[in-house]
């Protein structure tokens, strides 16, 4: 996120509007979509040091440092916990063609597994409406990846729900 730069000063407001309503306008045209926004962040110092002097959202550009903006995005992936790409991560064997994965992910957008939460868990009153929507959507998306046939267990839902609450 640190490398994001806005030439158009309305960019952050457009993103906030989209994250709140699922639509945004440019000129006379209104555009609707159903994708969530997830950001990947990296930090240039240790987590311990950053937390003592600032916060984990500090890498965001100044234009985005806004509680309304932070309340609206669905996840912040801690990039500092993701290993950097190395040659041993690649193979000369068979692999997954990304086109197939993209088509599968597009097809799975037709389904929601958010009701899986209600089968075993109850979200508390500490979540506001935006948080509840984000947690339900993130849990649903994760379940689509780990249990694509819709046959999930209480434990798989719990793991996805805990991750969704953390992000």
Language model: regions and residue ranges:
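Conserved AAA+/SF3 P-loop NTPase catalytic/coupling segment centered on the Walker-B
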Residues: 1-18, 42-52, 68-69
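Hydrophobic alpha-helical bundle architecture
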Residues: 4-14, 25, 54-61, 123-127
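Conserved Walker
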Residues: 5, 20-35, 58-66
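Conserved AAA+ ATPase small/helical "lid" subdomain
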Residues: 36, 72-160
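Long, highly charged low-complexity segments enriched in Glu/Asp and Lys/Arg with interspersed Ser/Thr
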Residues: 160-167
